[in-house]
Amino acid sequence: MDADVNLKTLPYRKCVGIVVFNHEGKVWVGRRLMTLAHADIDRSHRWQLPQGGIDEDEKPLDAAYRELYEETGIRSVKLIKEAQNWFYYDFPQELVACTLSNKYCGQMQKWFAFQFTGELSEIVINPPPDGNKAEFDQWKWIDLESLPSIAVSFKKHVYMKVVSEFRGSLRSL
């Protein structure tokens, strides 16, 4: 890690996280593409939910719709619920030097749950629509409760909160 980076002085990056339920109550997850920053991560723990930064002057819900489309091609969704609180996680020290140009110590995320109302053919990840950069090389539907077990270690506690926050959302599907 860059010796000049003091994690305690870096802010959290504002972003959104997105849970997409299908008609069976399963959750969409994508497997992150391998990068140098993720070289040490076991392939079985590279699965994650769509997420991304909130642009300046952008509302979190608008960012959620935008990020979901940019990463997955999905537009056909119905909002189910917005998490009441922001969830935080810290980047591991070894990732800070190569993640977002040493500008952030981690992420603060506003989470949203949506119901997918489209056709599977709408889901396009590699390459995603409109020239967006691919983030995933595979995707699948899984049980909500399985999220923490497939996540990278530094996101597990956030995924446990996501499960707790949206567990009741299954009843509204």
Swiss-Prot record:
Enzyme Commission no: 3.6.1.-
GO molecular function terms noted in the UniProt entry: bis(5'-adenosyl)-pentaphosphatase activity; guanosine-3',5'-bis(diphosphate) 3'-diphosphatase activity
NCBIfam families referenced in this protein's UniProt entry, alphabetically: PRK00714.1-5
Motif Nudix box: where in chain: 52-73
The protein's role, per its UniProt record: Accelerates the degradation of transcripts by removing pyrophosphate from the 5'-end of triphosphorylated RNA, leading to a more labile monophosphorylated state that can stimulate subsequent ribonuclease cleavage.
Sorted UniProt keywords: Hydrolase
Name assigned to this protein: RNA pyrophosphohydrolase
Limits of the Nudix hydrolase domain: 11-164
Any Pfam family the entry gives: NUDIX
Species for this entry: Bartonella tribocorum (strain CIP 105476 / IBS 506)
Cofactor requirements of the protein: a divalent metal cation
CDD domains per record: NUDIX_Ap4A_hydrolase_plant_like (cd03671)
Family per record: Belongs to the Nudix hydrolase family. RppH subfamily.
GO aspect biological process, one term: ribose phosphate metabolic process
PANTHER family reported for this sequence: NUDIX HYDROLASE 26, CHLOROPLASTIC, UDP/ADP-SUGAR PYROPHOSPHATASE
Superkingdom of the organism of origin: Bacteria
PROSITE patterns, alphabetized: NUDIX, NUDIX_BOX
